[in-house]
Amino acid sequence: VNKKLLLSLILVANGTTAQESASNRSPNGEIEHIEIKQFRQPYRGNVPLVQTPQAVDTISSEQLESESITRFMEALELTPSVVRQNNSGGMFDSFAIRGFSGDENNPSGYLVNGFNSRGYNGNRSTANIESIEVMKGPGSALYGQGEPGGTINIITKKPQFEEQGYIQATFGNYSKKQFEFDYTNSASKETAYRLNGAYEDSDTHRNHVSINSLHLSPSILWNISDDTSLSYEMEVLDQKKPLDRGVYILNNNFDDVNTDAFYGDIRDGAHQVEALGHQLVLNHKVSDDWHILTGFAYRDSSFEGVSSDTELSDGRQLIYTDASLLSRQRRARDYQALDVSARIELSGEIELGSVKHNILVGVDHYNFDIDTDYKVWRTAWGSGDTTYSINPNNPDYTQTQPEPVLKTLTEENQKGLGIYAQNLIELTEKSKVLVGVRVDKFEQDILNLRSDEAQSQEQTEFTPRLGFIYNANDKVNLYTSYAEGFRPNPGLDSNRNAFEPEETKSFEIGAKWQGVADRFSGSIALFDAQKTNMLTAEPDIGLSATLGEVESQGIEFQLTTELTDETVLALAYAYTDAKTANDVINADWGVPIPKGSRLINVADHIGHVSLKHYTTLLGKESYLGATVNYVGDRLGETTDANFILPSYTLVNLSASVELNDKVSVKLDINNLFDKTYFENSYHKLWTMPGSPTTYSASVKYQF
């Protein structure tokens, strides 16, 4: 086994990015792939990420394997400045980057192979992920609308022409049962195919909360000629799990909380998230210096179910005066989304005099439909009505369930057309200037089917990007950049009016280094960003409200080093000071939110330490690993500055042994010291506790 190769891959992945990966296997059988020579990532051109004036973290499949990560949201915790946000009862992946999140009532947005994954994604598996790129700061000047704190792009596993694959089974406490598989081979000299997926059927530490999910991803590659390739990928998701709002916290007492308690109703059953996606991409090499990349994506998704949720309105909630009565709402959701997008771009290089220009120009378009059917039942305000209340210490699931009544029934359509251009100008061998611009025409139409009223808006957004990068030597790059971004806000406010788009401005300065002294890779960045028209939740009515202008400043640091030829240490730290920049009155609650208020679920301090050691035990190639994750305290409710989620530190251990060339066994223990902690919050009565100690064993067979 080539330990040195694996250590090098980990160093590269933690530092910035690898443009190509080697055709070898890691100690745990991870398949490492060779990219097709003419294949280029969209919105990238011929400029590797390491040469861009931007903080970028790349999480490789090798890291996912060594950390035993099987969910996308867990992978994002490997990078600083990414924190969990309210995730709609555990149904979606939701995060903030550099303190900025999108709409709390919708899943966070990210790209898959450069296509926006709009709609409903559930809790994404990592089974088909080759790498995850976390590009900090607004990316609208290139990628179009996206999350304001940064752009996340998932690169999926591609078909290979050499037969390889694996199957893996994982079992653990809380009846965890998880299976993964991956197989790729050639069908002819010109075509190759791949099929991978994951299935899980597990309980959780939360009473009556289980997860059943299936992810499948078949793909085909056709090398039409030496210069042209056509690829097709499909993604299938079917996820079923109860919507779980977590626990309630009274008087900021986090000590006397039953973190296993479920306050919904077991008769509601599971919410279901379904998605079917298609991607078709044509790569053509026009000449040695120029490429054309064009693609089409179609994605149909839905989110349906009924839940019984703890009532949040003080005037309807009885738990504050009677510890035996927890008031509840009953909600029904039927959300449908359809996204169709296409793009075409030309990239290449030219020399004008002694100056080299790396040029990228393109056009993209999308059409996004989202239909919302939302029903709710709740007691009258101030009535003291005990209907559908439960005793939280002895819940009764035999009482009559009220029927939710229609609250929101809308049909929304968003259309966007973008034209973008970028030029990386190589002024000298060491100095480069990046200039980029994008123009977007955005249209939004919302039809309220209850009142037959329509809301429409049309805007044209101009988003520039400017950066400078200096190659101090072949190992170290220094950079500075300024970028602007925008993101359309979906839905209506409490007055049934459409929202203005979010707009972001960001400045950063930093350094990246790779392979210094053949052992050190990493980065450091200082950033300052502002955002307007940010949305926050109005939890009382399940809609959103404009928080106004917010700002975020901070520093990020990452370092990966080989302590020895067999041992790798990785350190990551982020300080984020994210707060409101103006005084605001919450429209629904009538609560003032003063300037300088913290942003919900954003920690000032985040730290991550990982130690990996490769060795031989009883003549078998083995791996030992330990990680320590620290998350600082966070605001738990936008309208209550005194509700603060405590900080926490978690320790995880892992070990694996290769029994032979084909079979390996892996053991994992997460939250080793069984710490009680809280991952995120929407409100003091909707606070999500983290998992206690979990352990699992995996057996992997590769072929």
Go through each PLM region and give its residues:
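Acidic/polar loop-and-plug regions of large Gram-negative outer-membrane beta-barrel proteins
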Residues: 200, 204, 216-285, 300-337, ...
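Acidic, small-polar-rich N-terminal luminal/periplasmic segments of exported/outer-membrane proteins
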Residues: 27-162, 485, 509
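Structural signature of Gram-negative outer-membrane beta-barrels, strongest in the C-terminal barrel
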Residues: 223-225, 337, 356-368, 410-531, ...
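C-terminal beta-signal and adjacent terminal beta-strands/loops
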Residues: 569, 617, 629-637, 656-703
